[in-house]
């Protein structure tokens, strides 16, 4: 059930006006998504973003628990920290427990490349590579990425499906629907709906063909 693993939040950062004499105060954003499989809530995805001057720090936490007849059949836990400066990734760290399989990813930036240690294996990436952690809508404009869980390289293809009206928690949203998929490994696929620049729903299909939705509270 690898495809249940979710790091689903896409958010747009507000513009922070700079003061004439003093640095702009940090802007902080907190969002929570409820993850639902069928009629059952199976987890949450939370994100905290702090934008201060030219630096953005991001903390993502995802918890998923699937139970069958009151017995836990699957658990997924993921934490991720990112630091961006002037639009460039400078540090990344994630820890994942995918139903007992654990991963540790650390990325640092050098002047002309990114240096990654993924589960004890070292590799170098171009500076254009970025984690497909889905907290920024910029993901639909980039195709060179890596899996935030495993560090696996990904090439993202985006399909523009068009406009749709969705009702979430009783509130109608005029949304734009995109599909994104990894063309290298083929395992990663998501449907994303935005109201303006803000993600309101994500859908994936589980390995058992169940529909899994992540809706903004």
Where are these regions (language model features)?
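Positively charged n-region of N-terminal signal peptides that target proteins for export
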Residues: 1-4
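Hydrophobic h-region of N-terminal signal peptides that target proteins for export
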Residues: 10-18
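Acidic, serine/threonine-rich low-complexity disordered tracts
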Residues: 20-111, 117-120, 125-217
């Amino acid at each position: 059930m690898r495809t249940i693993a979710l790091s689903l939040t896409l958010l747009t950062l507000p513009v922070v006006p700079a003061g004439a004499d003093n640095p702009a105060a940090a802007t902080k954003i907190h969002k929570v998504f409820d993850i639902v499989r069928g009629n059952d809530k199976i987890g949450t995805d939370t994100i905290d973003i702090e934008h201060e001057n030219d630096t953005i720090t991001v903390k993502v936490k995802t918890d998923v628990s699937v139970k069958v007849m009151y017995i836990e059949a699957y658990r997924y836990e993921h934490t991720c920290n990112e630091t961006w400066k002037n639009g460039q990734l400078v540090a990344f760290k994630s820890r994942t427990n995918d139903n007992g399989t654990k991963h540790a990813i650390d990325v640092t930036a050098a002047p002309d490349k990114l240096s990654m240690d993924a589960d004890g294996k070292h590799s170098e990436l171009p500076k254009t590579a970025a984690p497909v952690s889905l907290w920024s809508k910029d993901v639909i404009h980039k195709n060179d990425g890596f899996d935030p869980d495993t560090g696996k390289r990904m090439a993202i293809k985006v399909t523009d499906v068009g406009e749709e009206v969705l009702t979430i928690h009783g509130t109608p949203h005029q949304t734009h629907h995109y599909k994104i998929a990894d063309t290298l490994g083929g395992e990663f696929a998501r449907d994303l709906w935005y109201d303006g620049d803000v993600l309101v729903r994500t859908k994936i299909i589980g390995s058992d063909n169940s529909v899994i939705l992540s809706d903004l509270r």
